[in-house]
């Protein structure tokens, strides 16, 4: 959940998002150390007269500033590649949901059930109830079981869209004629909000996504009522 004037990322709900947060902190630490070193060198050069203005060759220094950046890039690339492969991994999903983007709403189909599908439209501001979020509430939430691997198949009926839920670390393009795949797993129950993250027309800002993660027993009851 995002908060007003929030400077950091949303709290992680999935293992992938937790890894992304760790990688974010790891990368920022490296950037902070490099920036501090560069600022220190610049300030030292500006405040002291002990500088070599006639140096023509310094093999040792050139070797250091060639090898050191290479090591830093490796330290950034290794955890990044690890997370990339984790995001592409699919291990026997317990449930598959097909998501279709439209101008300007989402439709969902639970492919493991014979007739469980619905459209999800944004609730207009004038119809919101007290406590509901403007531009983020929908008439039909996507109810999913927590602590289970869920596969999302994402495509579009018309133009480019993008299905994104920040707290789960998800952002997958919805492309007409192409079926993209992503997996998700929420570690705790709750409501998780997202939006279309690809400019898709005049009502692009009015395509919210709401995932309701619930215990398996509640999901089974809900799915039985929906079917």
Curated annotation (Swiss-Prot):
Keyword Ion transport: no
GO biological process: ATP synthesis coupled electron transport
UniProt-annotated binding residues for Cu cation A1: 161, 196, 200, 207
Chemical reaction(s) catalysed: 4 Fe(II)-[cytochrome c] + O2 + 8 H(+)(in) = 4 Fe(III)-[cytochrome c] + 2 H2O + 4 H(+)(out)
Gene3D superfamilies assigned: 1.10.287.90, Cupredoxins - blue copper proteins (2.60.40.420)
EC number of the protein: 7.1.1.9
Topological domains, Mitochondrial intermembrane: 1-14, 88-227
EC top class named in words: translocase
Transmembrane region(s): 15-45, 60-87
Keywords of the record: Copper, Electron transport, Magnesium, Membrane, Metal-binding, Mitochondrion, Mitochondrion inner membrane, Phosphoprotein, Respiratory chain, Translocase, Transmembrane, Transmembrane helix, Transport
SUPFAM superfamilies (alphabetical): Cupredoxins, Cytochrome c oxidase subunit II-like, transmembrane region
InterPro entries, alphabetized: CcO_II (IPR045187), CcO_II-like_C (IPR002429), CcO_II_C (IPR034210), Copper_CuA (IPR001505), Cupredoxin (IPR008972), Cyt_c_oxidase_su2 (IPR014222), Cyt_c_oxidase_su2_TM_dom (IPR011759), Cyt_c_oxidase_su2_TM_sf (IPR036257)
Bound cofactor: record note: Binds a dinuclear copper A center per subunit.
Entry-linked Pfam families: COX2 (PF00116), COX2_TM (PF02790)
List of residues that carry Phosphotyrosine: 218
Side Mitochondrial matrix, residues: 46-59
Membrane topology: Multi-pass membrane protein
Ribonucleoprotein recorded as keyword: no
Annotated residues for binding of Cu cation A2: 196, 198, 200, 204
Family: Belongs to the cytochrome c oxidase subunit 2 family.
Protein name listed in UniProt: Cytochrome c oxidase subunit 2
Gene it is expressed from: MT-CO2
């Amino acid at each position: 959940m995002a908060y007003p004037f929030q400077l950091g990322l949303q709290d992680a709900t999935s293992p992938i998002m937790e890894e992304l947060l760790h990688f974010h902190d790891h990368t920022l630490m490296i950037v902070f150390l490099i920036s501090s070193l560069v600022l220190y060198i610049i300030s030292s050069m500006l405040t002291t007269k002990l500088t070599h203005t006639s140096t023509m060759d310094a093999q040792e220094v050139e070797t250091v500033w060639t090898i050191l950046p290479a090591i830093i890039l490796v330290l950034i690339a290794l955890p990044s590649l690890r997370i990339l492969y984790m995001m592409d991994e699919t291990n026997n999903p317990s449930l598959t949901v097909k998501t279709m983007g439209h101008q300007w709403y989402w439709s969902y189909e639970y492919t493991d059930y014979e007739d469980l599908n619905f459209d999800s439209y944004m609730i207009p501001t004038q119809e919101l109830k007290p406590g509901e979020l403007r531009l983020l509430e929908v008439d039909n939430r996507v109810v999913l079981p927590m602590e289970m691997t869920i596969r999302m198949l994402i495509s579009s009926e018309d133009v480019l869209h993008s299905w994104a839920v920040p707290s789960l670390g998800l952002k997958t393009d919805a492309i007409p004629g192409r079926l993209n795949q992503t997996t998700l797993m929420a570690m705790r129950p709750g409501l998780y909000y997202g939006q279309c993250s690809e400019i898709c027309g005049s009502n692009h800002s009015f395509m919210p996504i709401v995932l309701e993660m619930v215990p398996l027993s509640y999901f089974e009851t809900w799915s039985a009522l929906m079917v």
